[in-house]
Amino acid sequence: MSKKFRSNVMLLITAIIWGSAFVAQKAGTVLEPFTYNGLRMLIGGIALIPVILIFSAKNKDDEQKSMEDKQTEKKTVLIGGIACGLILALASSLQQFGLYFETDAGKAGFITILYIVFVPVLGLFIGKKVRPIIWLCVLIGAVGFYFLTMAGSDAGFGLTTGDLFVLICAIAFACHILVIDHFSPKCDGVKMSCVQFLVAGIVCLVLMAIFENPSVTAIIDCWLPILYCGVFSSGVGYTLQVVAQKYAEPTAASLILSLESVFAVIAGVLFAGESMTGFEIFGCVIIFAAVILAQLPTKEERLK
């Protein structure tokens, strides 16, 4: 099994985890955005600490590294974790506020997923090369998400304040993918993920203390969705993303991660009693086709 294939499988698992967490997130919407994000991110970071300790005890490679290499990696973990954490806090909060300002859920999903377009566009500014087939996959994926989230809706496409929040959120998530792509090959992905969650959690909790008035009763009532999203969606999901992106092409990675919405629809059908329309099923098929097309080997790769 190649490293690229393993990375793609991990990204697919991440998309499944994030999609299934949609049901839990709906159950936790009674909490204000900074409160919800702060608690789930902090739990995600704390959940990774024992994982880091276990892997560190078993990892023999660290013993062979020089003191200078260890210091360099620690610095990279810290800088990368802080950078990713700040962007993650921004992106997740913008998304929550977009929904708070009553952006239609389907429209919000479509706008957010525009990060699959922003990744290659922003990547060009930092010297990233994108295979032509990826641009076609981005277009096919965008069409698929339209059918999945918006086709047949009476809401139209008028841009509201909430829509603007979600649009900026999509740009922030694209930046998050590119920043991870920059730092993850240079350090321990699990450690960097832990730092990013602790940073994002602290930032959101500070903003919560300034701008929100959280109810202890509401937090207690939502302990299960907070715990699920903190441990699985944040701790496991984002860590798999960080580790997988060591060997995955960032634009292809964003396409696989965009399957989150497909699995969110499936989870809604299985666990929340929701139903899928013909348009939604058609959108799922198109998106899967785009992702498969993006993973087909190039002529050079087939010859190797």
Where are these regions (language model features)?
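Specific transmembrane alpha-helical segments of multi-pass solute transporters/efflux pumps
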Residues: 21, 53-111, 147, 230-248
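C-terminal transmembrane-helix exit sites in multi-pass transporters
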Residues: 47, 51-52, 115-139, 262-282
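Juxtamembrane helix-loop-helix junctions in multi-pass membrane proteins
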Residues: 16-46, 64-68, 103-107, 175-199
